[in-house]
């Protein structure tokens, strides 16, 4: 009887594996967009602007816990000097001195606007790790087809990309259908209030956007070699987080006569229970679709199996 059960389970497992392999083989790559995008060569001025942006040490907090206002003032002047058409055709509003909102009026004001966001502040370079930098962190060196420095990937690249795109489109006489708002914060790295200030500013004006695009992912080649093509990662949500503050209120004691259960014992137990009670893991619809699209486009069998 036991042998029959084992044999049946083995047959079912074999059929299940065959089904997975069949589905993996049958999976077709997700159809690419039919839209053709003609990308113009990146102008040298854009590269220089990115390099210059990195050279401005807009550290959101220093060792003295006070921002370097001179650097943030320099950033404002840099934007005005580098993007004259943006400042000529868009309305620039300073929010609490160092955050900015640019309004680009569209042809159809009845449409809900789009918001493009980014931040130009960067984290400090700790003295203990400064020597590990292969290029000075605020040099903006252009070497080996790369622009080096703090903020090159978080997030001056995003801010400069938005400004370069806007400047180039304005140069060609482009006017968007929807109104666009370009919003740049100055204290994201320290979870500062500038984003809330911008939201309050927009809410007071009755602005309800169609979409908000903030920072974004990366275009990766090294991490997706099996695909044989670059992968652009578009984030559609943000992970949640929660912080707990645990406190114990218990009478004191003495090491010569320790209590059976001290405040530290109780706190340790609470921390242990908290650590061993994580939220249940789950795959949301966007994650499932991401895995399916990537897996079906991969030559890697493991990826294709995951897509099934």
Sequence positions of predicted segments:
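Acidic/His- and Gly-rich active-site-bordering loop/insert found
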Residues: 10-152, 171-176
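Solvent-exposed loop/turn segments at secondary-structure junctions
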Residues: 60-61, 108-109, 120-123, 187-191, ...
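Short, solvent-exposed loop/turn segments at the edges of secondary structure
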Residues: 97, 111, 135, 177, ...
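Acidic-enriched catalytic cores of C-N bond-cleaving enzymes acting on peptides and small amides
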Residues: 26-34, 202-205, 210, 218-228, ...
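Stable alpha-helical elements in mature extracytoplasmic
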Residues: 46-50, 71, 75, 158, ...
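Short glycine/serine- and small hydrophobic-enriched flexible loop segments
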Residues: 20-23, 164-171, 269-273
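Acidic/histidine-rich catalytic neighborhood of metal-dependent amide-processing enzymes
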Residues: 146-147, 151-233
